[in-house]
Amino acid sequence: MESEFPDTDEPVWILGRQHHLNEDKSKLLLDVSARLWFTYRRKFSPIGGTGPSSDAGWGCMLRCGQMMLAQALICRHLGRDWQWEKHKKQPEEYHRILHCFLDRKDCCYSIHQMAQMGVGEGKSIGEWFGPNTVAQVLKKLALFDEWNSLAVYVSMDNTVVIEDIKKMCRSPPQSSSTAHSSAHLHRSALGRNRNAAGLCTGWKPLLLIIPLRLGINHINPVYIDAFKECFKMPQSLGALGGKPNNAYYFIGFLGNELIYLDPHTTQSFVDSEENGTVDDQSFHCQQAPHRMKIMNLDPSVALGFFCKEECDFDNWCSLVQKEILKQQSLRMFELVQKHPPHWPPFIPPTKPEVTTTGAELIESTDKLFELEEEFEILSV
């Protein structure tokens, strides 16, 4: 595992951007240090009240999932080419993104929320997660994140279904009929179908996660070119993977080496300041990232992509047709137009209409009981 980049004419690819080491190494390092870097932390409030107060030794894949999602949020709010500079004042959205991941039970993508959501996926708190479990947990937590309003699609059986993604991302038009006015009120109270500006949009930004097994015990060399191709796509969010019980966030490659951010450093819990900003020094990796030979990768991985607009998704589909599906056999994954008839029907996931999480967002209980006929009232 090397750190310093060699002098070479080969291009380096980082999350859809190409860098040339012999021209400007510092630009590459700036690009890497702009990524949010999440590591093990200690001294946070115990998970679930009585659980662990550090994730050292078990939380590495959760941290990698946080890094991939944070990269999607940066692309959504600040753009792929946004740069982080030490001690420079950052936009409010940046602090808001960072706040989503602080180690507190009230932050939507905190280690607390992820570990507890993992219980529903059969993982006890403090147990190591694989890439697919993290993907399922992010998909569930995203339903409670109204600010970002992401559609999270996790592929099944190595197959991405275009029809299902379009169904999920094309926000349903708001009904104007009076019969639905109370539901309508309720939805706006919960902020559903609305973006940050309160407007209904035609496409929910898509976080697409593709869990894959690229071999049995070792990565099959037949997949290597296609795997590397994914890091060149402008929609790339890299990949989750590593070695058994040792997760890394892969952000690019140089030749036959993968470039990754490593969560295996234990830092102390950092909370936000009273004004909402976060002391962010420890959330950016300020040295050259690690590299490992692609053949040493465990075959269980999850690829990530972010499509802010529908045209980004259409562009991704044509890149996949061209680069991934050109192999006649042993394709890395399949991209199909129609939902396979033998699969159970696709139902876009929705957040329960009334939950304890949503309750604080409803101004008064009167409004809640107007809805009795339309929604079963869950315990609030």
UniProtKB/Swiss-Prot annotation:
UniProt record similarity statement: Belongs to the peptidase C54 family.
Q: Keyword annotations for this protein?
A: Autophagy, Cytoplasm, Hydrolase, Lipid metabolism, Protease, Protein transport, Thiol protease, Transport, Ubl conjugation pathway
Q: Which GO terms describe its cellular component?
A: cytoplasm
Recorded GO molecular functions are: cysteine-type endopeptidase activity; cysteine-type peptidase activity; protein-phosphatidylethanolamide deconjugating activity
Task: Name its GO BP terms in alphabetical order.
Answer: aggrephagy; autophagosome assembly; autophagy; lipid metabolic process; mitophagy; piecemeal microautophagy of the nucleus; protein delipidation; protein processing
The domain of life is Eukaryota
- Residues at the catalytic site: C60, D262, H264
What's the gene?
ATG4A
Give the protein name, as stated in the record.
Cysteine protease ATG4A
Q: What is the lineage of its organism?
A: Eukaryota, Metazoa, Chordata, Craniata, Vertebrata
Its Enzyme Commission number? 3.4.22.-
Q: Which compartments does it reside in? A: Cytoplasm
Motif LIR: chain residues:
375-378
